[in-house]
Amino acid sequence: MTRAVCPGSFDPVTNGHLDIVRRAAAIFDELVVATGTNVSKSRLFDPEERLEMLREVCADLPNVTVMGFTGLIVDFCRDIDAQAIVKGLRGGNDYEYELPMAQMNAHLTGVETVFLTTHASWGYVSSSLVKEVASLGGDVSALVPPAVHGRLQARLAAG
């Protein structure tokens, strides 16, 4: 059985993330969607909220499990016996950022990184952009799953 990990901050999960998850789930026997802590990013949702949203939007995917992790993603992969890391690429900047990490991960443990290009309709979507546009009153309902949109609106309304 081939197990892969699709890591991210998912703050919040977008339809672009979900597209990558669905496509990766069709490729691998088992996919673990893992949300971790990235100290360089400020968070709107805490880890448990992000896990809840991911579980809700991935509920229809029988071979997908949602888990949290701390530390290095390659250590998490080793702990759960995952053979690959799946990362979505929106464009060249993502590749420039992800390539050295993929090379380091392979150096540390031999875990391979599989890059999936984002569908053109989601290429401009990022969690950061969704949060910024939503905080300024813009309509992001087409960019996030409905359950996530409700939570996002409630969180921003609460201040």
From Swiss-Prot:
GO terms for biological process: coenzyme A biosynthetic process. InterPro entries: Cyt_trans-like, PPAT, Rossmann-like_a/b/a_fold. Pfam families: CTP_transf_like. Keywords: ATP-binding, Coenzyme A biosynthesis, Cytoplasm, Magnesium, Nucleotide-binding, Nucleotidyltransferase, Transferase. Pathway: Cofactor biosynthesis; coenzyme A biosynthesis; CoA from (R)-pantothenate: step 4/5. GO terms for molecular function: ATP binding; pantetheine-phosphate adenylyltransferase activity. One of its GO terms (cellular component) is cytoplasm. The record marks H17 as: Transition state stabilizer. ATP binds at S9, F10, H17, G88, L89, R90, E98, W122, G123, Y124, V125, S126, S127, S128. The keyword DNA damage does not apply. It is found in: Cytoplasm. Homohexamer. Reversibly transfers an adenylyl group from ATP to 4'-phosphopantetheine, yielding dephospho-CoA (dPCoA) and pyrophosphate. Belongs to the bacterial CoaD family. This is Phosphopantetheine adenylyltransferase.
